[in-house]
Amino acid sequence: MGWLDFNSNSKKEKGKDDARSSFSWGDNLNATDWQHYTDPRTLIPTLLLTTTILFSTRLYRSYLRRIPEATHIRPGFFRKRSLFGTVTRVGDADNFHLFHTPGGRLAGWGWLPGRKTLPEGKDLKNKTIHVRIAGVDAPEGAHFGKPAQPFSAEALAWLRDYIQNRRVRAYIYRRDQYNRVVATVWVRRFLFRKDVGKEMLKAGMATVYEAKMGAEFGDFEAQYRAIEKEAKKNKLGMWSGKKKDYESPRDYKTRTAAAANILK
C-alpha cells in the first residue's frame, strides 16, 4: 500500500484559496451588468417609454399649452401656427380678445372639470390674447376725446353679433406695436367656415387696410380688394353715403393725429 500524498492535496486546496482571494466582494458589488441593460426585455420598454414622454412633451408645448397673452407667443409660432379659442370681448370694430383653448373640445374645453366654463369679468385679466383682424380697417369709434366716424357703431355691433362668445381660429402673422396679434380669423357659421375680415368687407363694415407699413393679408389681398370694390358698387354699409362725405379710417387717423400734434 502506497503512502497518501498529503502534500499534493494541500497544494490543490492552496490553489483554490488563491483563486478565491483574487475576487473581492467589493469588486463583485461594483461591477456593472451591461447584459441586463441590453436585454430586449429591458431595452424595448425603456425606449418606448422615453419616446412617449418626449413626444408627449413636444405635443403639449407645441399644440396643447394654453397661451394667456400675446406676449407669451413664441416668435417661431408666427406664420406657422394658429390659435383656437373663444371670443370673450369685442372692444373695437376690427379687434377682439380671445381666450385660448388649445385642442378645443377634444382637449376637454367645455366639458372636462376645470375646463367646463371659461373665466368671466375680472377673472379674465391677463388671460386673453388681443387680436387685430388682418387686412381690414373698420371705422374708428370715439376714443381719447376724438369724435366717432360714421358707421363705427354699426361696424362694432356687426362684429359683436358675428363673433362674440363664439369659437374662432386665428392664423397669426405677427405682433404689432400695441401687442396685438395680427391674424386672419375664421369662424364657423352653421356648416361653413367664414373669413371674418372678408365678411366685414362684404357687408361694407370695413375697408381694405391702407397703411403702407405693417399691412398683413395672408394670401387674400386680391380677394379683399375685389370684395371691397363690389361693396362700394352696391353702396353697402359705410359706402351708402355721399362720396364727398366719405373719409377712410386711415385718413381719419392721419387727420386726427395731425390735429393733436398742433394742439401740443
From Swiss-Prot:
It is found in: Mitochondrion; Membrane. The active site is at 132, 140, 180. InterPro entries: SNase_OB-fold_sf, Staphylococal_nuclease_OB-fold. Residues 1-21 are annotated as: Disordered. It is a single-pass membrane protein. Residues 81-241 form the TNase-like domain. One of its GO terms (cellular component) is membrane. SMART domains: SNc (SM00318). The chain crosses the membrane at residues 42-60. GO terms for molecular function: endonuclease activity; metal ion binding. Ca(2+) binds at residue 137. Residues 10-20 have a biased composition (Basic and acidic residues). It comes from the Eukaryota. Keywords: Calcium, Endonuclease, Hydrolase, Membrane, Metal-binding, Mitochondrion, Nuclease, Transmembrane, Transmembrane helix. It is an enzyme of class 3 (hydrolase). Its EC number is 3.1.-.-. Gene3D superfamilies: 2.40.50.90. Signal peptide: none annotated. PANTHER family: EBNA2 BINDING PROTEIN P100, SERINE_THREONINE-PROTEIN KINASE 31. Belongs to the LCL3 family. This is Probable endonuclease lcl3. It comes from Sclerotinia sclerotiorum (strain ATCC 18683 / 1980 / Ss-1) (White mold). The lineage of its organism: Eukaryota, Fungi, Dikarya, Ascomycota, Pezizomycotina.
